[in-house]
Amino acid sequence: DPSVSLAGIGGAAMEAAGVQLVQAIGRFDVIGMVGPLALASLVYRFLFMRRLFHSEPWDAVVFIDHPGLNLRYAYFAKAAGLRVVYYIAPQIWAWRPQRMHWIKQRVDHVLVILPFEKALYDEAGVPCTFVGHPLLDAVAPRYDPVSLRAQFRLPLEGRVIALLPGSRRREVQMLLPMLLEAASQLARR
């Protein structure tokens, strides 16, 4: 819809999709930092977001994933009188289910990517729509399982476990050693 303008905090993919970036997401990346620098970064982000919500006549705010920070930002958005939509909702079924009360207070509509999540949010009285998983549209299988197993010299039978430590360099540095150790322990069994 050409009448809709989008502005946000994001990366190159969001910008290519037509979102006017008010700040690059890299400015918000503090994975693994500790101490005063991390605290200063958090304070900066909270102040930036609070000012952002009051700076323009926004119609709505769409938060994407990252519930640790985004549920807090949603508080500022609601306080500014904005409609709040949450895409890739907090996985309350997996951990910290007590967050549902924050979601009910701070989010107007949840967009879930897993079919069973809709029932959980419906039961809690949170308006919700199942929209499907973005990877199913973005990633089309290019190889059949037999070809992949041959390419990576894997047996034709048995389970294959992928180690996916993250998308950011710091995440990979922090998580890959633990994942490799876990894989080593599994292989010994």
Positions of predicted regions on the chain:
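Short hydrophobic signal-anchor/transmembrane segments that target glycosyltransferases
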Residues: 174-189
